């Protein structure tokens, strides 16, 4: 077993001993927030981990990588990557009783950049994540209509037909791209602010502020609804979905394994990334949440329970989603067949009702044999149920196009629409609780704001500032900006932060010390599984994912999808390269959090060296006299 531990002078001065820990907890009882009960804590963690990605990204990955075959690498990496890192964050937060900045600077002053990087990522992800909630609210407000506004195309100005853009695409596409986003044809074409989205964005940030105004004291109450209601709605949709025609086609298609996909490196890469992102690791929110626990809370059991719930939710949500997609695909297949039947009837003046789906092929052969010239002039659509099922969709396309189209075909469609968008709202809001915690607590640890400022004021200023920056997502090009941040803000930075977290605990703090801490907190040492995954397996997996991701991204041109009614293959989205200036944005979004870690470490070492330049051992002395938050004592 690897026992390498890097030199870390002054650690004993920065970390309270186990004997002092319970005393500190009692002293903090009146000043530091704590959970009302264990259920609050678990629901908050589940709500933070289980988000929109479980509903609209995991099903897409299953469909793209061999259906049930994708479950194999997903579950393997969930055990070897997700659970160990989740346990580590829970345990280190509970042991040191601080937020992300306080935890890592306590372990070593040069590691304060890890906490700052987590804060940056939480800020940037929250910046666009709440915009998705604003879109959800817009659809929710429009759901109280019969018929639903996206169920049919609007008429043109002359009232002689449908609007051309809608007629060439579909009513759900038109409502999403034109009525909601009023999207431009380029990220460079910013356009103007869409006032209806701005109003919804205002509502979204107002609701979030009310729910987080006093930290866990208010979020702990909200999670009773936001973390449980999605499961109720998912169950209702599953029951309803199973009664719809073709639902089983979707479920069978989802879980039918294509074993050959297991030899595809991208399958394992996507599985590892999905496990990583679905746990909301490296944001700093989970560390803060666990710091409010009792010293002797069983963090090991918590990590296992949250992981099981997270994995189960992904599979459960995929089942629900594909029951609806199966219904949608069957409806489209039936429409396709009926269109072909109508084409044949009109082409040969056949009596209506004579040609059915069952005898269509027989009539085709008869018509072709009777009058091949007339038959050759007819154009038939290709109707294949698997083609409709395999049209992979993820993200906003699944929520605002595929699901909304399926809902329009259900009886009492406004009811199902209201339920669906309530579910998405709760999933998004509960995830934002963790993002806000990942920003507010580090700012308090950094002492940037005056200590006399109440948390309500700090939270309000953060919400207001982020809300103003988020105006960019209300422009005509807002969807393109959101996709850009979604692709780069929450990808590589989180991977690097998580790797640094595990390296810091195992090789800087010391895994043997960490084992003793956990034994003190839960009553027994971590078993061999935790030892192997923390020391070797999990860091190695993250390193491999990073290398694969880096190789893939470096070797391909940055592209994005645009909605252009003048595109020759419209209504397909057109893939175009990003403008050159976007590369600078990518460097800022993905590079700044990553560079914060080494830059702050170098700055800290240089500063300490300069302060002790006259002492041959100045660097060691400087580090050994660091305070708990990583700053030098006078």
From Swiss-Prot:
The way it spans or sits in the membrane comes to: Multi-pass membrane protein
TM ranges are 42-62, 66-86, 120-140, 193-213, 222-242, 269-289, 305-325, 414-434, 457-477, 491-511, 532-552, 582-602
Residues modified by carbohydrate are 158, 182, 258, 354, 368
Q: Which UniProt keywords apply?
A: Amino-acid transport, Glycoprotein, Membrane, Phosphoprotein, Symport, Transmembrane, Transmembrane helix, Transport
Q: Where in the cell is it found?
A: Membrane
Give me the Cytoplasmic side stretches, as residue ranges.
1-41, 87-119, 214-221, 290-304, 435-456, 512-531, 603-634
Instruction: Cite the GO molecular-function annotations of the record.
Output: neutral L-amino acid transmembrane transporter activity; symporter activity
Q: Which terms does the UniProt entry file under GO BP?
A: neutral amino acid transport; response to nutrient; sodium ion transmembrane transport
Q: Which PANTHER family match?
A: SODIUM-DEPENDENT NEUTRAL AMINO ACID TRANSPORTER B(0)AT1, SODIUM/CHLORIDE DEPENDENT TRANSPORTER
Cited function: Transporter that mediates resorption of neutral amino acids across the apical membrane of renal and intestinal epithelial cells. This uptake is sodium-dependent and chloride-independent. Requires CLTRN in kidney or ACE2 in intestine for cell surface expression and amino acid transporter activity.
Return the similarity comment.
Answer: Belongs to the sodium:neurotransmitter symporter (SNF) (TC 2.A.22) family. SLC6A19 subfamily.
Q: What is this protein called?
A: Sodium-dependent neutral amino acid transporter B(0)AT1
Q: Which species? A: Rattus norvegicus
